[in-house]
Amino acid sequence: MPIPTQSQIGGEQQTAQAIADSVSTQMRVAMPGIIQSFDPDTVTCTVEVALRGIVGDGSTELKPLVDVPVIFPRGGGCTLTFPVKEGDECLLIFADRCIDFWWQSGGVQETVDPRQHDLSDAFAIVGPQSQAQKISGISTSAAQLRTDDGAAFVEVAAGHNITVKTPGQLTATAEGGTTITSPTITLNGNVTINGNLSQGMGESGGTATMLGPVTVTNDVKAGGKSLIQHTHGGVQNGSGNTTAPN
């Protein structure tokens, strides 16, 4: 008996839908993940997929993804890095084709496997935030490099002001020297200098004003005259004055 046309069409539609569902189920594009471990030497991580997979009519937990390359902002010989720890949230993105040879050798490579949009070809971008893990106090007027709690930050404001703040210690090391050019420099706090202190400005020098008191442990020289070792001529008893220091 011939099969009715409507039944044929229905069967074709069901077949096409089944194929589409199968392709959709196997195709990976992007999904959230949770870092389980990070290897700073290989710059890769192990990631738990944060969404369940679909198998048949039910859902199942996907196995952790291993050797996932971590993406740090990088270019022109400079890289922005930050700690990656267990529990950090990330976005997993999946390459169109197999990345094995590229990951091992860089450059332009052949695809060793015909797989596409596969779980094996993931990259991890650390930073997406669920509502359970989001930070607060985000500045709406400046760019900040900050700790999650906001206690320490480097800020570049739209008005050109730059601010550095930390409850901890600020350390700077410059082996090639340090130059600061500013109309005024204000230091609020005690200052300790481990090294020599000199004043430039050519032969005329510059002025120095201090409220004092000033305590000097060793000698002081003014105009080449030693405060400790200088002598005076014309010394005599009485109310007369000595001559200028030698």
Positions of predicted regions on the chain:
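Hydrophobic packing positions characteristic
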Residues: 2-175
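Intrinsic low-complexity, repeat-rich intrinsically disordered segments enriched
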Residues: 160-246
